[in-house]
Regions:
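N-terminal amphipathic/basic-hydrophobic helices that include classical n-h-c signal peptides
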Residues: 1-15
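Accessory RNA-recognition modules of RNA-modification enzymes
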Residues: 11-254
Length: 254
């Protein structure tokens, strides 16, 4: 009987799997980095990245093999978990901001508490630490008082836009003001509306977008190192007890 370097029999080792191989598994737990955990029929542990949820049965593609586990990216959800909810944001799954909008809010709180427990146990070395339940937020949308967006001359295209001729696209390719997609530091999604920001902040962003785009103001390029516009910061402050008497104050930094 042959063994790998970790002492695991080859017939039951993650090293028998290959990058690019498709696997199917039911997810039973959560882990760090917004990953879910599943086990294959041979007992191999797999961490699945993407908008998955505990209780999902998924098809995923392996992209990393370790001595004790596999890491895979979500490709298809075969059976949906009852812990899911419909994401409110139309950019969810593309935008690198929100990670858990596909989870019911009570499930989000459970996952956050578990992350604290895991950190205390596995990193801190505490045995059976006591961690109270998470205190729910009063508002889960429209609560942010600051958003920081990037200008880019390379707009991120959705899968649907990839099949549309450039002349028929509703937005130009060389302008975007928004957030980066995961793994795309040089491209940004042109965000029309962020559900975490207030309506006033979204209006401010849209005003700046139209002003800069219509006047064709130059955007800084990370490739040529030329251009002017790089970032937009919108901050909203409300004085305690003066919401009716005084309007909110804004700060825009370009």
């Amino acid at each position: 009987k042959s063994f790998d370097r970790a002492g695991v029999p080859w017939f039951n080792s993650p090293l028998m799997y290959k990058k690019g191989q498709m696997i199917e598994t039911e997810l039973f737990d959560t882990a760090d980095k917004n990953r879910c955990v599943g086990k294959l029929e041979d007992g191999i542990c797999v961490f699945v990245e993407g908008t998955a949820a505990v209780g999902d049965t998924v098809r995923a593609e392996i992209y990393k093999t370790k001595k004790r586990y596999l890491v895979a990216s979500l490709k298809e959800i075969l059976k949906f978990s009852d812990r899911r909810t419909a994401p409110r944001c139309k950019y969810f799954g593309l935008c690198g901001g929100c990670k858990w909008q596909h989870l019911d809010y009570s499930e989000q709180l459970r996952v956050k508490r578990k992350q604290v427990l895991d950190a205390l146990e596995h990193l801190g070395g505490f045995e059976t630490p006591e961690v109270a339940d998470c205190i729910p937020a009063e508002e889960i949308f429209g609560y942010r008082n600051k958003i920081d967006m990037d200008f880019t001359d390379r707009r991120y295209l959705t899968a649907d836009e990839m099949n549309i001729p450039e002349a028929e696209l509703s937005k130009p390719l060389d302008f975007a003001l928004g957030f980066h997609a995961p793994g795309c530091p040089f491209k940004a999604i042109d965000i029309d509306h962020c559900d975490l920001a207030s309506e006033e902040m979204n209006l401010a962003v849209e005003t700046v977008r139209r002003f800069c785009r219509d006047r064709k103001l130059s955007i800084y390029s990370t490739f040529t190192h030329e251009g002017f516009l790089r970032n937009l910061v919108v901050r909203r402050g409300e004085r305690t007890g003066e919401l009716i008497q005084a309007p909110p104050e804004f700060m825009l930094v370009i």
